[in-house]
UniProtKB/Swiss-Prot annotation:
The gene is PLD3. One of its GO terms (cellular component) is lysosomal lumen. The chain crosses the membrane at residues 39-59. Belongs to the phospholipase D family. It comes from Homo sapiens. It is a single-pass type II membrane protein. Homodimer. Interacts with APP. N-glycosylated. This is 5'-3' exonuclease PLD3. Glycans are attached at residues 97, 132, 236, 284, 387. CDD domains: PLDc_vPLD3_1, PLDc_vPLD3_2. Residues 60-490 are lumenal. 5'->3' exonuclease that hydrolyzes the phosphodiester bond of single-stranded DNA (ssDNA) and RNA molecules to form nucleoside 3'-monophosphates and 5'-end 5'-hydroxy deoxyribonucleotide/ribonucleotide fragments. Partially redundant with PLD4, can cleave all four nucleotides displaying higher efficiency for ssDNA and RNA fragments initiated with uridine and guanosine residues and lower efficiency for cytidine-initiated substrates. Keywords: Disease variant, Disulfide bond, Endoplasmic reticulum, Endosome, Exonuclease, Glycoprotein, Golgi apparatus, Hydrolase, Immunity, Inflammatory response, Lipid metabolism, Lysosome, Membrane, Neurodegeneration, Nuclease, Phospholipid metabolism, Repeat, Signal-anchor, Spinocerebellar ataxia, Transmembrane, Transmembrane helix, Ubl conjugation.
Length: 490
């Protein structure tokens, strides 16, 4: 018999009411939470954006060399760079068999001045754009005088004009610089004699940090009409122009009173572009590699290739030919006392022709101020041309003729070129080829490697061959009577 069970429903105790928030307070809390999340997001974005901005400003101001390892190539430059070779051909110097000539230096300078909008930086040796220094009425000075007039118009139009010039060691005309100061330009004299026992021999312009001129021409009226000069104008090439501005900024810094060369240059002056990592550019529509070198070595901040190293690299990498056109060639420290033998370039040229069979041609200037000791060194180089050594090296002297009136113009009628061209590379500099110009004197060079015909390299080669084959080039054994009294080396 089953026991009778009694079932009774158990009563679950009622839950005590929770401390619930009113609906309006819940909504307010959710809104506040959402707002806090948005504020936090905005703060995070602001911090990230500020960090990115400061990084960009730092890189723009101080350079980004430190971000790249020794084997990392910096990003290419996408500017449509255009290079134009410009020349000053002295009055009365004709090349009847030459094709259409290059633009003149004065045309190029006036064009750069006409296009300047914000800034013009000029690094220069000395200034005499009028012929007041000669106390003559020379009509060919008009081009230099026009350049000076146009320069004086820039600062009143809002263009920031800065001029770095070598401090003279003795009396020197200052009228041009005084006129430019009065027009609103800024001028600083760099005492290279105190700093390195040299001079500021550089010759370049930078316009709007976009275009520049670099070459052999001084700020001298004779450099436009009475002296043979060669340079290059780079248009629409801000990457290279900004890098050249860094070299100018070093001069500008050293032009301050009491300045000295830093033991370590601040990063502001550093560059990423050099012999090891040249700038990749599009030059006249074709790919090219380019960089700027500087002298002397104490004026080379981190990343900057010294001028001598750059020059020797071009010589050492030539496999077919080396053509050199330079005013002075001396394997000595000619301005040191006592004189010292300095065979750095001489050894490189001898090695190139003897070891690699490179064809070497030197076109050296000869005029009334040539150093007589050059002849012995040039004869020594020329003596390597021998059937037993199979060395192919030749030396010629370029003499600019002068009539009676032209001969009276002081420091004129000379080939002042300073360039080298090989089958691979172009070197356009501002220095003569003797030791002190690379060890003590401030100079700058542009180096370009470019393949193909029709480029800057082939144009410079054509100019050299035009001059080499001209009636103004003479072998070292030429009779002095055939060139008059214009040359001291025959």
């Amino acid at each position: 018999m089953k026991p009778k069970l009694m079932y009774q429903e158990l009563k679950v105790p009622a839950e005590e009411p929770a401390n619930e928030l009113p609906m309006n307070e819940i909504e307010a809390w959710k809104a506040a939470e959402k707002k806090a999340r948005w504020v936090l997001l905005v703060l995070i974005l602001a911090v990230v954006g500020f960090g990115a901005l400061m990084t960009q400003l730092f890189l723009w101001e101080y350079g980004d060399l430190h971000l790249f390892g020794p084997n990392q190539r910096p990003a290419p430059c996408y500017d449509p760079c255009e290079a134009v070779l410009v020349e000053s051909i002295p009055e009365g110097l004709d090349f009847p068999n030459a094709s259409t000539g290059n633009p003149s230096t004065s045309q190029a300078w006036l064009g750069l001045l006409a296009g300047a909008h914000s800034s013009l930086d000029i690094a220069s040796f000395y200034w005499t754009l009028t012929n007041n220094d000669t106390h003559t009425q020379e009509p060919s000075a008009q081009q230099g005088e026009e350049v000076l007039r146009q320069l004086q118009t820039l600062a009143p139009k809002g263009v920031n004009v800065r001029i770095a010039v070598s401090k003279p060691s003795g009396p020197q005309p200052q009228a041009d610089l005084q006129a430019l100061l009065q027009s609103g330009a800024q001028v600083r004299m760099v005492d290279m004699q105190k700093l390195t026992h040299g001079v500021l021999h550089t010759k370049f312009w930078v316009v709007d940090q976009t275009h520049f001129y670099l070459g052999s021409a001084n700020m001298d009226w004779r450099s436009l009409t009475q002296v043979k000069e060669l340079g290059v104008v780079m248009y629409n090439c801000s990457c290279l122009a900004r890098d050249l501005t860094k070299i100018f900024e070093a001069y500008w810094f050293l032009g301050q009173a009491g300045s000295s060369i830093p033991s370590t240059w601040p990063r502001f002056y550093d560059t990423r572009y050099n012999q090891e990592t040249p700038m990749e550019i599009c030059l006249n529509g074709t790919p090219a590699l380019a960089y700027l070198a500087s002298a002397p070595p104490p004026l080379c901040p981190s990343g900057r290739t010294p001028d001598l190293k750059a020059l020797l690299n071009v010589v050492d990498n030539a496999r077919s030919f080396i053509y050199v056109a330079v005013m002075n060639y001396l394997p000595t420290l000619e301005f040191s006392h006592p004189h010292r033998f300095w065979p750095a370039i001489d050894d490189g040229l001898r090695r190139a022709t003897y070891e690699r069979g490179v064809k070497v041609r030197l076109l050296i200037s000869c005029w009334g101020h040539s150093e007589p000791s050059m002849r012995a060194f040039l004869l020594s180089l020329a003596a390597l041309r021998d059937n037993h050594t199979h060395s192919d090296i030749q030396v010629k002297l370029f003499v600019v003729p002068a009539d009676e009136a032209q001969a009276r113009i002081p420091y004129a009628r000379v080939n002042h070129n300073k360039y080298m061209v090989t089958e691979r590379a172009t070197y356009i500099g501002t220095s003569n080829w003797s030791g002190n110009y690379f060890t003590e004197t401030a100079g700058t060079s542009l180096l370009v490697t470019q393949n193909g015909r029709g480029g800057l390299r082939s144009q410079l080669e054509a100019i050299f061959l035009r001059d080499w084959d001209s009636p103004y080039s003479h072998d070292l054994d030429t009779s002095a009577d055939s060139v008059g009294n214009a040359c001291r080396l025959l």
